[in-house]
Amino acid sequence: HDYQVTYVGHPLLDEISNKVKNSLFYKVNNLSAEPIIGVLPGSRKQEIAVKLPVMLSMAKYYPKFQFVVACAPGIEKSYYEQFVREQNVFYLFNQTYDILQNSEAAIVTSGTATLETALFNVPQIVCYKGSLISYLIARQLIKVKYISLVNLIMDSEIVKELIQADLNEKNLKFELDKLLTS
Protein backbone atom coordinates (compact mmCIF):
# COMPACT_ATOMS: atom_id res chain seq x y z
CA HIS A 1 0.00 0.00 0.00
CA ASP A 2 3.06 2.22 0.26
CA TYR A 3 1.86 4.31 3.23
CA GLN A 4 4.21 6.72 4.96
CA VAL A 5 4.37 5.81 8.66
CA THR A 6 6.30 7.04 11.66
CA TYR A 7 6.89 4.96 14.77
CA VAL A 8 6.52 7.18 17.83
CA GLY A 9 6.83 4.65 20.64
CA HIS A 10 4.60 2.51 22.79
CA PRO A 11 2.39 4.04 25.51
CA LEU A 12 3.21 1.26 27.98
CA LEU A 13 6.95 1.82 27.61
CA ASP A 14 6.44 5.57 27.96
CA GLU A 15 4.40 5.05 31.13
CA ILE A 16 6.98 2.72 32.64
CA SER A 17 9.92 5.00 31.87
CA ASN A 18 8.28 7.71 34.00
CA LYS A 19 8.01 5.55 37.13
CA VAL A 20 10.56 5.73 39.94
CA LYS A 21 10.70 4.12 43.37
CA ASN A 22 9.09 6.61 45.61
CA SER A 23 8.87 6.91 49.39
CA LEU A 24 5.71 8.96 48.85
CA PHE A 25 4.02 5.79 47.50
CA TYR A 26 4.65 4.13 50.88
CA LYS A 27 3.45 7.14 52.85
CA VAL A 28 0.27 7.85 50.85
CA ASN A 29 -0.77 4.19 51.10
CA ASN A 30 0.11 3.79 54.81
CA LEU A 31 2.75 1.17 54.05
CA SER A 32 5.74 0.51 56.29
CA ALA A 33 9.30 0.67 55.00
CA GLU A 34 9.40 -3.13 54.60
CA PRO A 35 10.03 -4.39 51.05
CA ILE A 36 7.04 -5.18 48.85
CA ILE A 37 6.00 -8.35 47.08
CA GLY A 38 3.46 -7.38 44.44
CA VAL A 39 0.44 -9.62 43.97
CA LEU A 40 -1.48 -9.37 40.68
CA PRO A 41 -4.35 -11.88 40.97
CA GLY A 42 -6.20 -10.99 37.77
CA SER A 43 -9.32 -9.02 36.98
CA ARG A 44 -12.17 -11.55 37.16
CA LYS A 45 -13.75 -12.68 40.42
CA GLN A 46 -13.57 -16.37 39.51
CA GLU A 47 -9.81 -16.26 38.86
CA ILE A 48 -9.20 -14.13 41.94
CA ALA A 49 -11.15 -16.58 44.13
CA VAL A 50 -9.07 -19.51 42.88
CA LYS A 51 -5.60 -17.95 42.91
CA LEU A 52 -5.55 -15.21 45.53
CA PRO A 53 -5.81 -17.51 48.58
CA VAL A 54 -2.75 -19.46 47.38
CA MET A 55 -0.90 -16.24 46.52
CA LEU A 56 -1.63 -14.69 49.91
CA SER A 57 -0.71 -17.87 51.78
CA MET A 58 2.88 -16.67 51.23
CA ALA A 59 2.45 -13.72 53.60
CA LYS A 60 2.82 -15.89 56.70
CA TYR A 61 6.20 -17.16 55.49
CA TYR A 62 7.58 -13.69 54.78
CA PRO A 63 6.68 -11.42 57.72
CA LYS A 64 9.45 -8.97 56.78
CA PHE A 65 7.72 -8.23 53.47
CA GLN A 66 4.49 -6.44 52.65
CA PHE A 67 2.20 -8.20 50.19
CA VAL A 68 0.49 -5.51 48.14
CA VAL A 69 -2.40 -6.65 45.97
CA ALA A 70 -3.16 -4.76 42.76
CA CYS A 71 -6.96 -4.72 42.81
CA ALA A 72 -9.00 -4.70 39.62
CA PRO A 73 -11.26 -1.73 38.96
CA GLY A 74 -14.91 -2.66 39.23
CA ILE A 75 -14.40 -5.23 41.98
CA GLU A 76 -15.33 -3.91 45.40
CA LYS A 77 -12.78 -3.80 48.20
CA SER A 78 -14.95 -6.04 50.40
CA TYR A 79 -14.52 -8.85 47.88
CA TYR A 80 -10.74 -8.74 48.34
CA GLU A 81 -10.91 -8.31 52.10
CA GLN A 82 -12.37 -11.79 52.56
CA PHE A 83 -8.93 -13.15 51.63
CA VAL A 84 -6.95 -11.18 54.26
CA ARG A 85 -5.48 -13.45 56.89
CA GLU A 86 -2.18 -11.77 57.62
CA GLN A 87 -1.21 -8.35 58.95
CA ASN A 88 1.25 -7.72 56.12
CA VAL A 89 -1.33 -7.76 53.27
CA PHE A 90 -2.60 -4.53 51.68
CA TYR A 91 -5.06 -3.87 48.85
CA LEU A 92 -4.59 -0.94 46.46
CA PHE A 93 -6.71 0.16 43.51
CA ASN A 94 -5.51 1.88 40.33
CA GLN A 95 -1.84 1.66 41.31
CA THR A 96 -0.56 -1.45 39.54
CA TYR A 97 2.45 0.29 38.00
CA ASP A 98 3.37 1.97 41.29
CA ILE A 99 3.13 -1.39 43.04
CA LEU A 100 5.37 -3.02 40.43
CA GLN A 101 7.87 -0.17 40.50
CA ASN A 102 8.26 -0.61 44.25
CA SER A 103 8.25 -4.44 44.36
CA GLU A 104 11.18 -6.73 45.05
CA ALA A 105 9.27 -9.63 43.46
CA ALA A 106 5.78 -10.36 42.17
CA ILE A 107 3.27 -13.18 42.03
CA VAL A 108 1.34 -12.62 38.81
CA THR A 109 -1.67 -14.14 37.07
CA SER A 110 -0.98 -15.16 33.49
CA GLY A 111 -1.87 -12.42 31.01
CA THR A 112 -0.70 -8.94 30.04
CA ALA A 113 0.43 -8.33 33.62
CA THR A 114 3.34 -10.75 33.12
CA LEU A 115 4.75 -8.58 30.35
CA GLU A 116 4.17 -5.40 32.35
CA THR A 117 5.96 -6.94 35.33
CA ALA A 118 8.91 -7.92 33.14
CA LEU A 119 9.13 -4.39 31.71
CA PHE A 120 9.55 -3.14 35.29
CA ASN A 121 12.39 -5.66 35.76
CA VAL A 122 10.59 -7.30 38.66
CA PRO A 123 11.33 -11.00 39.20
CA GLN A 124 8.05 -12.89 39.00
CA ILE A 125 6.26 -16.18 39.33
CA VAL A 126 3.41 -16.64 36.85
CA CYS A 127 0.31 -18.41 38.13
CA TYR A 128 -2.60 -20.00 36.33
CA LYS A 129 -5.36 -22.20 37.64
CA GLY A 130 -8.74 -22.61 35.99
CA SER A 131 -11.44 -25.24 35.96
CA LEU A 132 -10.03 -28.64 35.08
CA ILE A 133 -12.37 -29.13 32.14
CA SER A 134 -11.52 -25.72 30.64
CA TYR A 135 -7.83 -26.42 31.09
CA LEU A 136 -8.04 -29.84 29.42
CA ILE A 137 -10.02 -28.46 26.48
CA ALA A 138 -7.57 -25.57 26.06
CA ARG A 139 -4.58 -27.97 26.13
CA GLN A 140 -6.13 -29.91 23.26
CA LEU A 141 -6.98 -26.85 21.16
CA ILE A 142 -3.97 -24.63 21.85
CA LYS A 143 -0.48 -26.02 21.46
CA VAL A 144 1.99 -23.71 23.19
CA LYS A 145 4.99 -24.44 25.38
CA TYR A 146 4.28 -21.57 27.78
CA ILE A 147 1.41 -19.49 29.10
CA SER A 148 3.19 -16.27 30.07
CA LEU A 149 3.76 -13.62 27.43
CA VAL A 150 7.36 -13.23 28.59
CA ASN A 151 8.15 -16.89 27.95
CA LEU A 152 6.15 -16.99 24.72
CA ILE A 153 8.00 -13.97 23.31
CA MET A 154 11.40 -15.34 24.34
CA ASP A 155 10.47 -18.94 23.43
CA SER A 156 12.20 -19.97 26.64
CA GLU A 157 11.28 -20.25 30.31
CA ILE A 158 12.49 -16.87 31.56
CA VAL A 159 9.93 -16.73 34.38
CA LYS A 160 8.65 -19.70 36.37
CA GLU A 161 5.12 -20.80 35.55
CA LEU A 162 2.97 -22.64 38.09
CA ILE A 163 -0.01 -24.09 36.25
CA GLN A 164 -3.07 -25.94 37.57
CA ALA A 165 -2.05 -28.49 40.25
CA ASP A 166 1.49 -27.06 40.34
CA LEU A 167 0.03 -23.84 41.75
CA ASN A 168 0.00 -24.76 45.41
CA GLU A 169 1.44 -23.35 48.62
CA LYS A 170 4.48 -25.64 48.71
CA ASN A 171 5.58 -24.96 45.12
CA LEU A 172 4.88 -21.24 45.33
CA LYS A 173 6.96 -20.91 48.51
CA PHE A 174 9.81 -22.88 46.91
CA GLU A 175 9.84 -20.60 43.86
CA LEU A 176 9.45 -17.41 45.88
CA ASP A 177 12.36 -18.46 48.10
CA LYS A 178 14.48 -18.80 44.95
CA LEU A 179 13.45 -15.35 43.69
CA LEU A 180 14.11 -13.60 46.98
CA THR A 181 17.51 -15.19 47.57
CA SER A 182 18.94 -14.77 44.07
What is the meaning of each model-derived region?
Residues 1-182:
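Nucleotide-activated sugar donor-binding and catalytic core shared by glycosyltransferases
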